[in-house]
Amino acid sequence: MTYIETLNWIHSHKANGRRPSLERMRYLLNLLDNPQDKFPAVHVVGTNGKGSTTSFLQHILTASSYKTGTFTSPFITRFNERIAIDGKEISDSNLVKTAQAIKPIVDSNVFQEKVGKVTEFELVTALMFCYFATINPIDVAVIEAGIGG
C-alpha cells in the first residue's frame, strides 16, 4: 500500500450511522495482542483544553527523558499529526507499515461477521495503539479523548 492508499483505506471506514463499539474495539485489540496494555497512558478528557493539556504533558514527559506518544484529534493540516512521538508526527512510511500490520484482521470476513466493520475512529485508535506498542515502542502515551470528551 502507498501512503495515499493507506489514507483512502482509513477514510473508507466512515461510521455511516454506526456508533463506535466497545465490544468491537475489545475484540479487535484482543486479536492485535492487546497493544494498549504494553505501555502506561494518561487519558486527557474534558470539555475544553484537551489539546493544550496533552501538549503540556507531552513536553513535560519528553523533557523528563520519557519517549512519549500522543494521540490527538482532529488534525489541523495533515492526518499524521494525530499520532506523534516526542512531538514528531508518524512518518508516512510508518503509517503505511502500521496499517499493513492490522489491515488483514480489520478487513477479514470473520472479523466483520462477528462484530461488524470498524469505524474510522476505531481504526485510527487501533493504529495508534499498534504503532506505540510494536512499530515504534514508547515509554508512556498521552491520549486525548476523541469522542465524548
Sequence positions of predicted segments:
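Short functional linear segments
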Residues: M1-G46, T53-Y66, F71, V110-G116
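Conserved phosphate-binding and hydrolysis motifs of nucleotide-dependent enzymes
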Residues: G46-G49, E144
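Conserved active-site and cofactor/substrate-binding residues in soluble primary-metabolism enzymes
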Residues: P20-E23, S52, I90-S93, K97
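Short active-site-proximal "capping" loops at secondary-structure junctions
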Residues: N48-K50, F75-I76
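ATP-dependent carboxylate-amine ligase catalytic core
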Residues: L29, N34-D37, A63-G149
